[in-house]
Amino acid sequence: MKSSKKNKVLSTLAQLLNSRSDEIMRANGADMEAFPHMDASMHDRLKIDDNKIAGMIHSLEEVAAQADPEGKILYQHTREDGLKIENRSVPFGTILIIYESRPDVTIEAAATAFKAGNRILLKGGKEAFHSNTLLTRLWQEALTVNGEEIHWVEYLNLNREETQQLIRNNSRGWT
């Protein structure tokens, strides 16, 4: 995907976060109500307010402003026999990120992975389920509006056992 298209998706997502901030805060309110006895640090990580939305938008703008790392030539050398050797940055492919009660990670981690040309699978904590699923839907809306497939950013609604099984199944042959 061209860098200009990636940046357009990021810009569209920033616009969606801004225009749908009330909806985001309602979804976050459902998360907050589901866990009324959380400690103060958990509360601060989970809570989405206008400032946190502004921070997510700022993060998207910063990622869009960065040079596209995909396909960048890091090193190049031509041997005496004419063989050209090149070290070029390429996407990993698919990245799985498991995180707890920080819904802003749904935006920020996915933005970094997407800009680098990677698909991302997100597995957030159960305490941020409503926030994370809505933020993922907004990601997918930004992708769709720009003619891209939604598979670039997906949310995994898995319990602990299913998550461990996914990791075990995908780790075979690596250890």
Explain the meaning of each model-derived region:
Residues 5-8, 19, 23, 51, ...:
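Conserved active-site and cofactor/substrate-binding residues in soluble primary-metabolism enzymes
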Residues 19, 144-145, 168:
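Secondary-structure boundary motif
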Residues 40, 90-91, 170-171:
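Short glycine-enriched loop/turn motifs at secondary-structure junctions
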Residues 147-150, 160:
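Intrinsically disordered, low-complexity linker/loop segments enriched in Gly/Pro
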